[in-house]
Amino acid sequence: IVGGKTAKFGDYPWMVSIQQKNKKGTFDHICGGAIINVNWILTAAHCFDQPIVKSDYRAYVGLRSILHTKENTVQRLELSKIVLHPGYKPKKDPDDIALIKVAKPIVIGNYANGICVPKGVTNPEGNATVIGWGKISSGGKQVNTLQEVTIPIIPWKKCKEIYGDEFSEFEYSQITPYMICAGAEGKDSCQADSGGPLFQIDANGVATLIGTVANGADCGYKHYPGVYMKVSSYTNWMSKNMV
């Protein structure tokens, strides 16, 4: 997360750290995710190397720091299923979204809980918040404590123009109607924030998941907002697959 601040532990209990086994056999944080319910997590498809080996990945919830996976608030979750959206193709992205089923249900409490998902297709506007353990500048260092930043949602037509022809060397130059763009100069999601939640909190304090971090250009680059998969466009696919 670029331009953000450290989140208060427990403020965002739906946040997930997705970790991948490295050559030493230990696990590194690679992506964020959001708890949808006790069995399912939503994340980005590009987090997983294909062909997928489920045992190479784990999810952690209730983390204060990605270094401290043994604290008593933490649940370490093995994965029983990884469902990539059928429209997703590696290195190209219309449908960079994936569901993870955990092997044992998540125990709900102060530090682990689901986030609401939109009921129908919505067109969010105004500001939204994105959180993650990703880098704090493009190619920069990763942080151990969860970061949060509030960013403006960019109107879709404007975003499509921004990522026009001249910029097609970026993977995400194809801005589809199933995407949301958000971000301002110096405030953005970044590498290793992928899959994490973009959400809005209403006057009653209820949070709704509106996007998952896809990619976008260099982090926090002034003219180019971050790109998110629009969750409300995928709720039918989600409910069909969360079985």
From Swiss-Prot:
Q: Which UniProt keywords apply?
A: Disulfide bond, Glycoprotein, Isomerase, Secreted
Q: Which residues form the Peptidase S1 domain?
A: 1-243
One function term, GO molecular function aspect: serine-type endopeptidase activity
- Glycosylated residues, per the record, are 127
CDD domains in UniProt: Tryp_SPc (cd00190)
What EC number(s) is this enzyme filed under?
Answer: 5.-.-.-
Task: Give the signal peptide range.
Answer: none
Respond yes or no to whether keyword Aminoacyl-tRNA synthetase is given for this record.
Answer: no
Compartment annotation = Secreted
Q: Tell whether GTP-binding is among the UniProt keywords.
A: no
Name the catalytic site residues.
46 (charge relay system), 96 (charge relay system), 194 (charge relay system)
Per its UniProt entry, what is the enzyme's top EC class, as one word? isomerase
Database matches in Pfam families: Trypsin
Cross-referenced Gene3D superfamilies, in alphabetical order?
Trypsin-like serine proteases
Question: Entry's InterPro entries?
Answer: Peptidase_S1_PA (IPR009003), Peptidase_S1_PA_chymotrypsin (IPR043504), Peptidase_S1A (IPR001314), Trypsin_dom (IPR001254), TRYPSIN_HIS (IPR018114)
Organism superkingdom: Eukaryota
Described function: Acts cofactor-independently.
Subunit info? Heterodimer with venom peptide isomerase light chain; disulfide-linked.
Q: Which family does it belong to?
A: Belongs to the peptidase S1 family.
Q: What is this protein called?
A: Venom peptide isomerase heavy chain
